[in-house]
């Protein structure tokens, strides 16, 4: 399927192997497709957060600099997430995996097929997403706030259950390091 982002075939030893062309004698292929959502921006991408800061925080600072650290104590971020209604993906993850000599595409099948052979990939994948979430969103805004005399507070999405945290940020606790006033959303 030419529209597939990654194509895999079953392999007795490895579980699955990514292929880029049809394989003789193979009739069953497992395809992974890449879909995007207009409802979400890629906050794992540092360029996206830089643009967000430039278009919001920098504008506030340009207009209200004299209030920063006084009347304007800080910024509140509400439920940042990489996307909670589908399996998350960012091209930035591919770059991060390449730094270790791996391809994220080679393991994507393990986000959908549960087998012990895929555990290491799933763990590395979600740890990578969480690190990108913390470094490229929370830390960037936290550092900007600190440099401009104000504080950062807010909360992530789905703090109430560990499994649900995988949907939005892979874990919420690491982000608290980069909030002056960490918060959670408890609605009942």
Write out the residue ranges for each language-model feature:
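Aromatic-lined carbohydrate-recognition surfaces of secreted/lumenal glycan-active proteins
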Residues: 72-80, 125, 129-167
């Amino acid at each position: 399927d030419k529209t597939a982002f990654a194509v895999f075939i079953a392999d007795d030893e490895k579980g699955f192997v990514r292929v880029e062309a049809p394989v003789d004698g193979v009739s069953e292929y497992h395809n992974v497709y890449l879909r995007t959502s207009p409802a979400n921006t890629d906050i794992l991408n540092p360029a996206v957060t830089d643009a967000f800061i430039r278009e919001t925080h920098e504008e506030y600072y340009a207009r209200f600099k004299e209030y920063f650290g006084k009347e304007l104590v800080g910024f509140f971020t509400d439920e940042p997430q990489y996307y909670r209604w589908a399996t998350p993906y960012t091209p930035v993850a591919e770059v991060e995996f390449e730094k270790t000599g791996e391809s994220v595409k080679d393991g994507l099948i393990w986000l959908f097929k549960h087998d012990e052979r895929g555990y290491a990939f799933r763990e590395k994948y979600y740890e990578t997403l969480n690190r990108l979430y913390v470094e490229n969103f929370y830390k960037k805004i936290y550092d900007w706030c600190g440099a401009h005399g104000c504080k950062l507070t807010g909360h992530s999405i789905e703090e109430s259950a560990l499994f649900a945290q995988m949907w939005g940020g892979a874990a919420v606790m690491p982000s608290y390091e980069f909030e002056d006033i960490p918060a959670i959303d408890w609605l009942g």
